[in-house]
Amino acid sequence: MIKKHIVRCTVILVLLVAAGVFAYHMPTTAKSHSENGTTTLKDTTQTTPKAAVPLSHMAQLNFADETLPLGDARVERKMKMVLTAYTYGRLQTNRLHRKAAEWFPVIEPILAAYGIPDDFKYIALVESGLQEGTSHKGASGIWQFMPGTARIYGLKVNRKIDERKNLRKSTIAAAKYIKELYHIFDSWTLVAAAYNVGDVHIQKQINKQNQDNYFKLKLNRETGGYVYKLISMKEVVENPARYGYRPAKGLIAYRQENKFKAYN
């Protein structure tokens, strides 16, 4: 009789232990009540949040097919920081996407006609996508040409007319300028940097530092971050959902009348 009791207790104990182990591996559930009064179970198991810019995605980032130097912690950290600055959570506007839809149909075929990589269209957004007008240095238009440079590449700039504000004509001028810069540097990232600060300055830094890799050159803060901005602009325009952008409805839109016109 005692043996039967011991065997019965042992079986019960084994079943309890097995049930405990099974419960330990089950996801936690919580009850929730819907409007119609029915009760459903909701899985509350915690998951690891995704990184803002996974390393696998970082390897795919590029400007005009020139990629980031992988394994460079400084470059990767800077890229993540600039990308974060262009998320919807930071900008709170879809103005960039509206400008891209308005400008790119005019810009893209012109760049292609001059053999310029399509990614250079993002210079227009970086220069004028969030804020248009004339800079304190005198640069104006979507491509932010200085008066002297604009005239060199065929634009009329005087008291009566300023073709820097003509999307089509200024894009043709920009394409000519970019193509000329490529003949000097033979690197699209260096061309972008030279567009920002001037070819003389970039050439001087290349000679001084004996370095012709944009990502390894020590440049001033604005130029040193310029290509990172272009890559970030490309990312948020081509992959809007990844960076928090939603359809225009409900967004805090930046309302400003477009001052530029495209002429055929």
Predicted regions and their residues:
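Catalytic and substrate-binding regions of cell-wall glycan-acting enzymes that process beta-1,4-linked
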Residues: 43-86, 141-144, 148, 158, ...
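Short, functionally critical alpha-helical segments immediately adjacent to catalytic or ligand/cofactor-binding
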Residues: 116-131, 191-196
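Substrate-binding/active-site groove segments that recognize
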Residues: 138-159, 173, 178
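Solvent-exposed, polar/charged alpha-helical surfaces in well-ordered, non-transmembrane soluble domains
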Residues: 105, 109, 121, 172-179, ...
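Residues that scaffold the ATP/ADP-binding catalytic core of kinase and kinase-like folds
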Residues: 133, 152-153, 205
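An acidic, Gly/Ser/Thr/Pro-rich helix-cap/linker signature
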Residues: 2-114, 245-251, 258-263
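Solvent-exposed, acidic/flexible segments
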Residues: 89, 93-104, 113-116, 135-143, ...
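Short polybasic/polar patches that bind polyanions
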Residues: 109-112, 151, 207
